[in-house]
Amino acid sequence: MNQTGDQEVHFREIQQFKQRLLWILLLGASVFVVTFFGYGMIKQILFGQRWGSRPMSNLALAIVGPGTMLFMIGITYLFYSLKLITEVRNDGLYIRFFPLAHRIIPFENIKSCEVRTYSPIKEYGGWGIRHGRKGKAYNVSGNRGVQLELSEGKPLLIGSQKPKELGRTINKKRNKSLI
């Protein structure tokens, strides 16, 4: 058990996007965009040769080219830095989808918790912070997780590579908070 501030951490899992196809597509698109605009900028701005049948002005190319390259590099870095951090502490369940979202669910707000296998694409439309026909999901890879029913009746799925341990820890802490 770890300490975070004055809170004891009973379970902690850090997950990142590891889907090979995602990374092939993302890195491939980034390399293509950087190469494409890099070639065009060198050809037109440095060598003075028109790039394309209707070329941009040098100023527009000097703005759009690096802007598009930075955008693609930024998207790639964002996916690289995304982490789903799930913690069970004394006062509740902490879910962080760093750097985008942070949520704390007190145990008294969890009506039920069960481990289940799910279909990320069919049920939620993929991975990430998703809203689907079965409620909201936080997931980054795989097809196993913990299904919660919250006190307001909303279902919430948390994807996990250790779903049994996560479910057991949530239920243990949840039962203690009900006593």
Question: Which role does the model predict for each range below?
Answer:
Residues 13-18, 95-157:
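Non-transmembrane, membrane-adjacent beta-strand/coil modules in membrane-associated proteins
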